Amino acid sequence: MKSLEIEEKINKIKWCRRSNSSHFLLSTNDKTIKLWKVFDKSLKVVAENNLSNELTPSGPVGGGGVPRPPPRSSFKDPSLLKLPRMTHHDTVVAAVPRRTYANAHAYHINSISVNSDGETFISSDDLRVNLWNLNIQDQSFNIVDIKPANMEELTEVITAAEFHPTSCNWFMYASSKGTIKLADMRQRALCDEHSKRMPPLWYECVYDDGFFFNPLIVFEQEEDASSRSFFSEIISSISDVRFSNDGRYIVSRDYLTVKVWDVNMERQPVKTIPIHEHLRPRLCDTYENDSIFDKFEVVFSGDAENVMTGSYNNNFMIYPTDQEKDTEIVLQADKSAFKAKKVGVPTPMNRGANGKKNGSRSTSPVGPGSRMKKETDADQIDFNKKILHMSWHPYEDSIAIAATNNVWPLPPSHLYLHLIVVRGNIN
């Protein structure tokens, strides 16, 4: 047997829904999931004690004063003694682990997602998805298992999984083949019939919540056979998948594109946004430096009118989900973003001779703290500076970006001017 050291890192963090004044979150590394309680901890110091009246005029102890020996008669009477008095000094954020969920995954965990019922969550690795109860740490249920009897027959792995934001029975998981599978736990205990090449069940079910649902929905866009290459399977692998807050839309990210799907139309995405189309001729280079395996996240805005994802050179982009709009905002996570006094104007993506968007941008005014033109020359791209992780506030236009070793929070006042241009409220 070999002892394998588990790297000290956090793969995913998810907030639990609040049921009281306490805050809880789930975190996971490659093998272990933990539930944390997060709270404000009050730090107190001694403000008054028995020596408080026996100090030099220069100040109390700890503030520069030097205590002098008390008179011999100071504490002869017990009534003169008093308990130390504590006062509030500072408030810090503290976290304590409440539960540990371990020994359920044979492969590295890539996703966790908390259910809308506030009681359960799922975790996924390369081949399985497990269902947990937040209150039970030593037992889980396997709801997806795509491991073949012979591992040589393995053709895909699970890359991400997420619960539906409002219906506690639905969840989806994405694969390295570029497919998204939407499953309903009310159908059966193991929700992977399509993964095991079972015959499809062409029927719809109606439930009390009013949803019509085919339990075997697979979202997949057929690939053009003429454009298939050695890298096709790698670049089609989905690195992240999210529901919109209302559960109507799904957004997915692969290496070259972002796709927006309607849950009622699985045959093709309602919008495909080119992200790294300028890197297609340089896929050999990205393969050699392993950049082609970078896992970029994608997020919806709270109203689902925009999506945001990251790129290289510490750039991140915001796009409208409306099919009729092709405007793009490119921003860069650097210190100048917080010194900006004016905002650049986003420009539409250029179209090639065939009328399709080619992912390049026309020149546009650039305000301090913004980059309205994404670098399209692969030789000028710094592949070590990349935006992989991000978050968008569910109720306001505030975002948080992780760039190298820094977190960049952008408040509504900075983001608002960019978004109103995308939403078409100003010319």
Which residue stretches match the model-derived regions?
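Conserved beta-strand element within WD40/beta-propeller blades
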Residues: 24-29, 121-124, 171-175, 250-253, ...
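C-terminal transmembrane module of eukaryotic multi-pass membrane proteins
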Residues: 293-313, 388-391
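General structural concept
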Residues: 1-28, 35
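Sequence/structural signature of beta-propeller domains
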Residues: 30, 115, 126-128, 155, ...
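Loop/turn segments within WD40 beta-propeller blades
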Residues: 14-22, 112-118, 161-168, 241-247, ...
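WD40-repeat beta-propellers
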Residues: 33-39, 124, 129-135, 180-184, ...
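Inter-blade linker and blade-boundary elements of WD-repeat/beta-propeller domains
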Residues: 1-7, 40-109, 130-162, 187-237, ...
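Blade-level signature of beta-propeller repeat domains, shared across WD40, Kelch, NHL, RCC1
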Residues: 389-427
